[in-house]
């Protein structure tokens, strides 16, 4: 009998509309069918995914299951390790920009199977003021909206919740920010 590989799933029980802890057994079965012995660890507060992955024992695969924020925390924690782990992501949040980048839909079980049937790829990690990010970074007028929009509104209205928050600031003046950045060794500065 072939030895099972080890997998830790770090999941955010408060992400989006679709993650239900009652389905974790189903996800575990999918992982086992793909040769993984899985352990599930739920996050309890902001920053917890970062703490969890940074203190994990060596394993074959870590899966972040949550929104963009959960994945960003997991990436940040993984970067703090000397022995980085193979990290994957299953999107379960409200917007799931990272999930869209990876080509995922809304069906968690299908996404999990796609991930486990796929191949490991490296991806770029960018850093702004010491803070890693993997998909997009922004600054300026509307950047507070994802953080200010209440979880209750997001669960009730989905994307529309962000629009509701954005309308509140739409007519306020726009401030330009001086920004310096470096890409491939070339530094640029300007007001944006």
Task: Describe the role of every protein-language-model region.
Residues 13, 65-67, 90-92:
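Glycine-rich beta-strand-to-loop/alpha-helix junction loops that act as flexible
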Residues 15, 71, 94:
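Short, glycine/acidic-enriched loop or turn micro-motifs at the edges of active sites
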Residues 47-48, 69, 140:
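Short alpha-helical
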Residues 34, 41-43, 81-192:
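Catalytic core of DAGKc-family lipid kinases
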């Amino acid at each position: 009998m072939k030895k099972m590989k080890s997998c830790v799933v770090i999941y955010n029980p408060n992400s989006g509309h679709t993650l239900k802890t009652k389905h974790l057994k189903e996800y575990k079965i999918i992982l086992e069918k793909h040769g993984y012995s899985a352990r599930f660890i739920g996050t309890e507060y902001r920053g917890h995914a970062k703490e969890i992955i940074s203190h994990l024992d060596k394993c074959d695969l870590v899966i972040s299951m949550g929104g963009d924020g959960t994945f960003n925390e997991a990436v940040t924690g993984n970067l703090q390790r000397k022995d980085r782990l193979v990290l994957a992501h299953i999107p379960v949040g409200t917007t799931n920009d990272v999930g869209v980048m990876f080509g995922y839909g809304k069906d968690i079980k299908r996404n999990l199977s796609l991930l486990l049937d796929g191949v490991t790829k490296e991806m770029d990690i960018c850093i702004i003021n010491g803070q890693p990010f993997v998909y997009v970074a922004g600054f300026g007028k509307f950047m507070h909206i994802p953080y200010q929009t209440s979880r209750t509104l997001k669960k009730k209205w989905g994307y529309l919740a962000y629009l509701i928050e954005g309308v509140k600031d739409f007519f306020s003046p726009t401030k330009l920010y001086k920004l310096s950045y470096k890409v491939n060794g070339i530094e640029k500065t300007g007001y944006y």
